């Protein structure tokens, strides 16, 4: 063994030496000859001598090697003995042999592994087949067993207990019917747990009502994303808010001291704030009362409302007073205020906004924190509800409305309040306290009989310190206006050299006594009743003004006088085109007797306006691309091109630098010829782009729609009240209509065909107490047609004839145009919808659109933001930095690496029909209770908008042949365009985008080539441009249309003409332009010198 070990060590040592020498030993030693074989080599190597002269003897191997057979055949000389080879050669030969053996071994392992893998996979597949078959057999066995069991049970019951089983089933049926009958009869009464005979002590323990078993789907606090309130130090009205605390002094919530209409003072709070050992901390230091001293007077678990009666004079002890209430039937969408305590113990007033309904609660935009539960919301100095908490799914807080109990929480008579625009619960959706009016009286009688009042009746109540409390039930008549003349106010009769005094005296017509006219008109008070001595002058004014167009009559140009003329003018007469229209069209409904109902009068008006249309085709010569002539209406409008003011020309000659700034702009042509020319150019471009555009696949559209819904999810809003049920509701419509009218722009044009009645603006119908009910019936009738009539396949003229929509008036916008556009004749066209269609759109979409304006900070659409102040510019830059997830300084420095500012040329004309449909689908998915009626109304409205009749100024009607094209005068234009612009960015692959109209900022990963396939012409800005402003620094945004603004200012006004209205409008425009150019103080100073009229000029 020792000898064998020595040999092995020798071989290893020889192998190491072989690595140090060249590998040429094998051929030099003759081992590469044909006679070499491994057996001989091994024997020779073990018995021969090494090159060092060392001879190794092996007892196991013989020294004689038989002659090689190949030697005798080939005549080769016998090889040298292996002992003559070096150790390197021997080791190399052994290593070669080992390598070859290893390869053979690895090949064998691979072969066997593959064989075993196949066997294992085959076994697994076979086992899987057997398992599936066994599972199916088990399912079949269980299913058949169930049938067998049911069969045997039924057979057993039929054989032995048939009569008993029938009796049990009949009893169950009777029980269900009885329960439903009881719920139908007095289900509303079960909502309240009222006790007056026996005092109920407030005792809510954790053992009796553990928080873990609560089934409420609400959280108690939330900060609304995107809503930015104001917070100021202020005490609550009458110090009526009381802090609730635990027995150890830690904060719990809030309660409110309220005064009921029966004269009693009660404590109101959310029921979940009433916990064991809660304390009321008074406004007087050291004064507090335990809640257990109060009786639970009125409670409603459904809305978490509670009202408690306390010991005698408890409010005086705590240093608080009772606030008045506004109940659920008088709540509207309006700004409100709630109060809470700061960390330093100071009372703070927080702004909030009531936006709608959430079941039997109200949705409120407010930012609350833990511990704000129970705090009241105030409208003015009246409490409208209690803070409840928030929904887990929606982006708003919840307010508990105050139940309406006549004689207790609300009066028994009608009176005026400071409440707001429309009601939320003036329909059948909110019935907590009562179901019908007769039930209300019965329930109130029962409630009053069970209550023993320990405080003074209201008739004996007096609060000496309360100077804001009006006597309830006392109607204060409107004050009569003082006498005034027909002319302009005397303080408007002279120019002043100081701009500040000039703006103060000229701007501010609310200080004028003539505002009484408009206020009285809005309130519906007849001026002849309060100022009969003016009747003769009013009649004289009506005779000379016709339909309110008395432009040449002295005094009518004053803005306060125009409102009076429109409201009190005659419905007939006048020597203008409106008279001839009535002669052509027939009877004037304004001349009908006053005993007709508003609905009947509305039908007369519909026939009157329908008589304007002449649907016989008129040959207009050249065919218009995308539009075809389909009829005519009388020529109501006579637009004229604005002339360049002489005052502006004199300024440009006098100040050459001012002329250079305004160079390259001009006023566009006006009238039907200019409208038709521009319409052809725009339509031709639109059709060319639409041919090359490609509609994305249904899967791609669904992905983008889902992404948009996710991006706008915080703007989820409720459906209109009029369409909340299965049928159109008149009561709900009145509330929607009231809110829509309150937000109208009264000086906007009324549209076609209503201009034929003589009132050119919305004000003439809205402020007329006789026409406003007719207007509501006209809008409601159109909604009924949209809900019941099918619009599929109808042509634009058929839609108008069926009363589903009105023609869209087209006119050239009277703003400066670039000279290149003037030369081409490509003017900016405005497509203005009628007053009825405007109100229909507001009823259907106003909740969503207003919510988007309030929450612009958290959605991609930005129509709600402004750049008028430094603070607004900084806020937007900071907001944009948060969107990109960088710092504001890095954003302004490296914006080219982070975003792409883009603008779409001719965006309104590039909007396709499928884009409008997808945008409407997003709106529907963002509507909380969007039922079939709401979808049908909106889809029909969209079809009418996409297939419009265009009315030119000369009365020509052009029917739209290709659906699409956004109408610039529609109520949804700003909101819809912004969302479609974001939609296009998502199709282009942008990871984020913000947009306002056709302007957008999108992520750097967007693919601009996709826009061409969508039909858009996109231009990339070289600067950080958005909303017609270039952002230079965090606080500086420069407007890009400075030349256009100045051209409009100096060439669009004649401030030296002596007309007060012209002067007032010019000064307003001047102040606005100077404010926009505040970044260039040198230019502002020069403009102030050049553009302020001479102070010595008098008004003639």
From Swiss-Prot:
Record keyword Kinase present: no
What is the annotated signal peptide range for this record? Answer: 1-25
> Where along the chain is composition biased (Basic and acidic residues)?
530-542, 578-595
PROSITE patterns from the UniProt entry: PEPTIDASE_S39, RDRP_SSRNA_POS
Q: What transmembrane ranges does the database entry give?
A: 131-151, 165-185
- Stated EC number for the protein is 3.4.21.-, 2.7.7.48
Keywords, in A-Z order: Host membrane, Hydrolase, Membrane, Nucleotide-binding, Nucleotidyltransferase, Protease, RNA-directed RNA polymerase, Serine protease, Signal, Transferase, Transmembrane, Transmembrane helix, Viral RNA replication
Which top-rank group of organisms is this from?
A: Viruses
Catalytic activity, as annotated: RNA(n) + a ribonucleoside 5'-triphosphate = RNA(n+1) + diphosphate
Every copy of the Peptidase S39 domain together lies at 224-416
Q: How does it sit in the membrane?
A: Multi-pass membrane protein
Record's subcellular location = Host membrane
Similarity comment: family membership = Belongs to the ssRNA positive-strand viruses RNA-directed RNA polymerase family.
Protein name, UniProt field: Protein P2-P3
């Amino acid at each position: 063994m020792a000898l064998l070990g020595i040999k092995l060590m020798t071989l290893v040592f020889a192998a190491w030496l072989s690595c140090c020498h060249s590998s040429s030993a094998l051929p030099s030693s003759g081992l590469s000859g044909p006679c070499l074989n491994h057996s001989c080599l091994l024997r020779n190597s073990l018995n021969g001598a090494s090159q060092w002269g060392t001879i190794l003897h092996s007892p196991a191997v013989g020294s004689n090697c038989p002659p090689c057979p190949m030697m005798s055949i080939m005549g080769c000389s016998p090889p040298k003995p292996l002992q003559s080879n070096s150790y390197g050669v021997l080791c190399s030969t052994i290593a070669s042999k080992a390598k070859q053996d290893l390869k053979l071994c690895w090949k064998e392992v691979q072969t066997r592994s593959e064989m075993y893998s196949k066997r294992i996979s085959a076994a697994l597949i076979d086992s899987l087949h057997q398992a599936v078959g066994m599972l199916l057999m088990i399912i079949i066995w269980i299913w058949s067993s169930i049938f067998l069991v049911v069969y045997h049970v039924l057979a057993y019951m039929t054989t032995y207990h048939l009569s008993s089983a029938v009796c049990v089933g009949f009893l169950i049926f009777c029980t269900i019917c009885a329960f439903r009958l009881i719920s139908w009869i007095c289900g509303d009464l079960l909502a309240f747990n009222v006790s007056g005979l026996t005092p109920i002590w407030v005792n809510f323990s954790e053992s009796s009502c553990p928080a873990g078993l609560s089934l409420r789907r609400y959280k108690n606090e939330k900060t609304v994303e995107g809503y930015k309130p104001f917070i100021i130090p202020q005490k609550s009205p009458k110090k009526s808010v009381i802090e609730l605390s635990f027995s150890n002094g830690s904060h719990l919530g809030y309660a409110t001291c309220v005064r009921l209409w029966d004269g009693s003072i009660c404590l109101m709070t959310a029921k979940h704030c009433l916990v064991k050992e809660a304390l009321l901390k008074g406004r007087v230091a050291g004064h507090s009362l335990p809640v257990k001293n109060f009786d639970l007077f009125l409670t409603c678990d459904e809305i978490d409302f509670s009202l408690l009666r306390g010991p005698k004079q408890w409010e005086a002890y705590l240093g608080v007073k009772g606030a008045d209430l506004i109940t659920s039937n008088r709540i509207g969408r309006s700004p409100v205020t709630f109060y809470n305590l700061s960390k330093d113990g100071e009372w703070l007033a927080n702004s909030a906004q009531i936006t709608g309904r959430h079941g039997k609660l109200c949705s409120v935009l407010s930012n609350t924190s833990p511990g704000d539960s129970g705090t009241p919301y105030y409208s003015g100095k009246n409490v409208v509800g209690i803070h409840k908490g928030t929904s887990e799914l929606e982006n708003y807080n919840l307010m508990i409305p105050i139940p309406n109990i006549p004689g207790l929480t609300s009066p028994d008579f009608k009176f005026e309040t400071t409440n707001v625009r429309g009601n939320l619960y003036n329909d059948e959706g909110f019935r907590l306290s009562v179901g019908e009016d007769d039930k209300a009286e019965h329930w109130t009688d029962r409630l009053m009989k069970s209550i023993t009042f320990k405080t003074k009746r209201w008739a004996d109540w007096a609060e000496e310190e309360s100077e804001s409390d009006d006597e309830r039930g006392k109607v204060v008549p409107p004050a009569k206006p003082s006498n005034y003349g027909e002319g302009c106010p005397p303080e408007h009769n002279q120019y002043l050299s100081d701009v500040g005094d000039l703006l103060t005296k000229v701007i501010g017509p609310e200080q004028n006594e003539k505002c009484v006219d408009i206020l009285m008109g809005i309130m519906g008070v007849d001026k002849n009743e309060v100022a009969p001595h003016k009747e003769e002058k009013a009649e004289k004014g009506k005779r000379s003004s016709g339909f309110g167009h008395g432009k040449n009559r002295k005094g009518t140009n004053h803005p306060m006088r125009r409102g009076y003329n429109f409201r009190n003018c005659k419905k007939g007469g006048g020597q203008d085109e409106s008279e001839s229209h009535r002669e052509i069209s027939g009877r004037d409904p304004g001349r009908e007797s006053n005993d007709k109902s508003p609905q009947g009068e509305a039908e007369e008006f519909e026939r009157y306006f329908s008589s304007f249309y002449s649907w016989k085709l008129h040959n207009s010569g050249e065919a218009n691309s995308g539009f075809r002539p389909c009829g005519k209406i009388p020529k109501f409008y006579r637009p004229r091109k604005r002339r360049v003011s002489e005052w502006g020309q004199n300024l440009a000659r006098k100040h050459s630098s001012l002329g250079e700034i305004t160079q390259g702009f001009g006023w566009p042509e006006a009238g039907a010829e200019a409208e038709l020319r521009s319409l052809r150019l725009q339509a031709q471009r639109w059709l060319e782009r639409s041919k090359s555009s490609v509609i994305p696949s249904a899967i791609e559209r669904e992905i983008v729609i889902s992404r948009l819904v996710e991006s706008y999810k915080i703007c989820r809003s409720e459906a209109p009240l009029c369409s909340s049920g299965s049928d159109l509701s008149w009561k709900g419509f009145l509330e929607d209509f009231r809110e829509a009218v309150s937000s109208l722009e009264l000086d906007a044009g009324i549209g076609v065909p209503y201009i034929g009645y003589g009132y050119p603006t919305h004000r003439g119908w809205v402020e007329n107490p006789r026409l406003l009910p007719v207007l509501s019936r006209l809008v409601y009738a159109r909604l009924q047609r949209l809900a019941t009539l099918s619009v599929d396949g109808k042509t634009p003229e058929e839609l108008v004839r069926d009363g589903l929509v009105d023609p869209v008036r087209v006119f050239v916008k009277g703003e400066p145009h670039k000279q290149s556009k003037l030369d081409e004749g490509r003017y900016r066209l405005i497509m203005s919808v009628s007053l009825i269609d405007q109100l229909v759109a507001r009823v259907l979409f106003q909740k969503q659109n207003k919510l988007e304006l309030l929450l612009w900070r958290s959605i991609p659409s930005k129509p709600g933001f402004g750049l008028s102040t430094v603070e607004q510019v900084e806020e937007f830059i900071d907001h944009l930095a948060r969107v990109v997830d960088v710092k504001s300084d890095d954003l302004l420095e490296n914006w080219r690496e982070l975003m792409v500012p883009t603008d779409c040329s001719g965006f309104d004309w590039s909007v396709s029909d499928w884009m409008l449909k997808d945008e409407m689908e997003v709106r529907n998915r963002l509507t909380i209770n969007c039922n079939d009626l709401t979808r049908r109304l909106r889809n029909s409205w969209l079809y009418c908008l996409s297939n419009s009749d265009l009315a030119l100024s000369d009365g020509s009607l052009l029917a739209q042949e290709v659906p699409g094209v956004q109408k610039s005068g529609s109520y949804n234009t700003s909101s819809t365009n912004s969302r479609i612009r974001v939609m296009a960015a998502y199709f282009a692959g942008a990871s984020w985008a913000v947009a306002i109209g056709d302007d957008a900022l999108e992520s750097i990963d967007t693919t601009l080539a996709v826009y061409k396939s969508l039909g858009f012409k996109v231009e990339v800005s070289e600067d950080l441009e958005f909303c017609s402003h270039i952002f230079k620094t965090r606080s500086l945004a420069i407007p890009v249309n400075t030349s256009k603004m100045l051209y409009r200012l100096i060439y669009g006004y004649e401030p030296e003409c002596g007309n007060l209205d012209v002067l007032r409008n010019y000064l307003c425009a001047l102040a606005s332009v100077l404010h926009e150019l505040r970044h260039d103080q040198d230019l502002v100073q020069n403009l102030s010198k050049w553009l302020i009229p001479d102070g010595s000029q008098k008004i003639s």
